[in-house]
Amino acid sequence: MEVNILGLTATALFIIIPTSFLLILYVKTASNEA
């Protein structure tokens, strides 16, 4: 099975972007409550 760099990058971005977005949102909420 050949590793598709473009597909791998797209998958990584698809996972990382929402995760980082939720993480930032959580940090903002936590700092507001503190």
Swiss-Prot record:
<keyword id="KW-0602">Photosynthesis</keyword>
<keyword id="KW-0472">Membrane</keyword>
<dbReference type="GO" id="GO:0009523">
    <property type="term" value="C:photosystem II"/>
</dbReference>
<dbReference type="Pfam" id="PF05151">
    <property type="entry name" value="PsbM"/>
</dbReference>
<dbReference type="GO" id="GO:0009535">
    <property type="term" value="C:chloroplast thylakoid membrane"/>
</dbReference>
<keyword id="KW-0604">Photosystem II</keyword>
<protein>
    <recommendedName>
        <fullName>Photosystem II reaction center protein M</fullName>
    </recommendedName>
</protein>
<feature type="transmembrane region" description="Helical">
    <location>
        <begin position="5"/>
        <end position="25"/>
    </location>
</feature>
<keyword id="KW-0150">Chloroplast</keyword>
<dbReference type="InterPro" id="IPR037269">
    <property type="entry name" value="PSII_PsbM_sf"/>
</dbReference>
<keyword id="KW-1133">Transmembrane helix</keyword>
<dbReference type="InterPro" id="IPR007826">
    <property type="entry name" value="PSII_PsbM"/>
</dbReference>
<keyword id="KW-0674">Reaction center</keyword>
<keyword id="KW-0934">Plastid</keyword>
<dbReference type="GO" id="GO:0019684">
    <property type="term" value="P:photosynthesis, light reaction"/>
</dbReference>
<comment type="subunit">
    <text>PSII is composed of 1 copy each of membrane proteins PsbA, PsbB, PsbC, PsbD, PsbE, PsbF, PsbH, PsbI, PsbJ, PsbK, PsbL, PsbM, PsbT, PsbX, PsbY, PsbZ, Psb30/Ycf12, at least 3 peripheral proteins of the oxygen-evolving complex and a large number of cofactors. It forms dimeric complexes.</text>
</comment>
<comment type="function">
    <text>One of the components of the core complex of photosystem II (PSII). PSII is a light-driven water:plastoquinone oxidoreductase that uses light energy to abstract electrons from H(2)O, generating O(2) and a proton gradient subsequently used for ATP formation. It consists of a core antenna complex that captures photons, and an electron transfer chain that converts photonic excitation into a charge separation. This subunit is found at the monomer-monomer interface.</text>
</comment>
<keyword id="KW-0793">Thylakoid</keyword>
<keyword id="KW-0812">Transmembrane</keyword>
<comment type="similarity">
    <text>Belongs to the PsbM family.</text>
</comment>
